[in-house]
Amino acid sequence: MNWHLPLFLLASVTLPSICSHFNPLSLEELGSNTGIQVFNQIVKSRPHDNIVISPHGIASVLGMLQLGADGRTKKQLAMVMRYGVNGVGKILKKINKAIVSKKNKDIVTVANAVFVKNASEIEVPFVTRNKDVFQCEVRNVNFEDPASACDSINAWVKNETRDMIDNLLSPDLIDGVLTRLVLVNAVYFKGLWKSRFQPENTKKRTFVAADGKSYQVPMLAQLSVFRCGSTSAPNDLWYNFIELPYHGESISMLIALPTESSTPLSAIIPHISTKTIDSWMSIMVPKRVQVILPKFTAVAQTDLKEPLKVLGITDMFDSSKANFAKITTGSENLHVSHILQKAKIEVSEDGTKASAATTAILIARSSPPWFIVDRPFLFFIRHNPTGAVLFMGQINKP
């Protein structure tokens, strides 16, 4: 009999170092790059929607799955991710610890859990390796009562994301007879801006959405020194980007949008990768600029099944081909029935108090250049020491 293995990722972010760094396009960047490729597939079918995902969360769940896979299923996962988890477990463990380190100052929580019908039926090496590399816990639930199982999992999710994400699961996603395991990843981030946006500067301004319509939305504003730059995509279309650091300075928000308002956001998205973002970090220069940025909240739930299949991860969704022999002790044939991610982002003025130097800059007399985000844009929340992209998305209408 074939058993369902639903997977659920969720991510939550509220926005207002370790000593060892990793080489360009490091292991974590490869993981994040998989998430960016998934994002590229998602936006093709939803070009005008607000999309929020966690590339790091996607990489974590695929990594946990890889530890339970065998044969061609495992090969497909490793090929798309571009690494085998077993061979780099120690490095992944270091990266995961670095991302949640208190040295970041900003709050980052990554939680992983396997909810199972019977923990005694799960292979010990699968549990041990996931606990060691991904700090994954195992919890028993009664899938024969889908409503109760959903309540238990949703309560865990809500707690791990500080109440930002609830109702991830609905009972109809759990088969009381066939479901054997639910794998969940939660990523939570709360960052305070290094240079706070003063509430009195927030005004309603015009934002031209992806559908061409104009909307009046609250816009944050501040005059300060930020690292920014511009470059061209292979199609010779130019776009601008800026780094907005959080107060711990190990995590930043990066914003990118086309230079010309006539250029659609979709024209630059295929160009984006962790390697591209690395290049931004090397060419950006500090400038005193007037930043105008929408104040927004966006939440999106995405089924990652089809995007992953397009990338080449197909067997794990096929009940006749999936091979997760390293997960259960019995002869049950597991396959993935769902792989969902729900992510939420809130961007507001909140942050540390503005410094005296910043206050002085705010009243400088010379006219600075402007960085105005008044049309669809991309955002990235990046852990700079490792290159991990914790969150990314497109905002077409704040």
Curated annotation (Swiss-Prot):
A molecular function (GO) term: signaling receptor binding
Designated name of the protein: Glia-derived nexin
Keyword Oxidoreductase: no
UniProt function note: Serine protease inhibitor with activity toward thrombin, trypsin, and urokinase. Promotes neurite extension by inhibiting thrombin. Binds heparin.
Family: Belongs to the serpin family.
Annotated glycosylation sites: N118, N159
Localization in the cell: Secreted, Extracellular space
Source species of the chain: Homo sapiens
GO terms under biological process: cell differentiation; cerebellar granular layer morphogenesis; detection of mechanical stimulus involved in sensory perception; innervation; long-term synaptic potentiation; mating plug formation; negative regulation of blood coagulation; negative regulation of cell growth
PROSITE patterns to which the protein is assigned, alphabetical: SERPIN (PS00284)
Signal peptide, first to last residue: 1-19
SMART domains documented for this protein: SERPIN
Gene this protein is translated from: SERPINE2
InterPro entries recorded: Serpin_CS, Serpin_dom, Serpin_fam, Serpin_sf, Serpin_sf_1, Serpin_sf_2
Keyword terms of this UniProt record: Developmental protein, Differentiation, Glycoprotein, Heparin-binding, Neurogenesis, Protease inhibitor, Secreted, Serine protease inhibitor, Signal
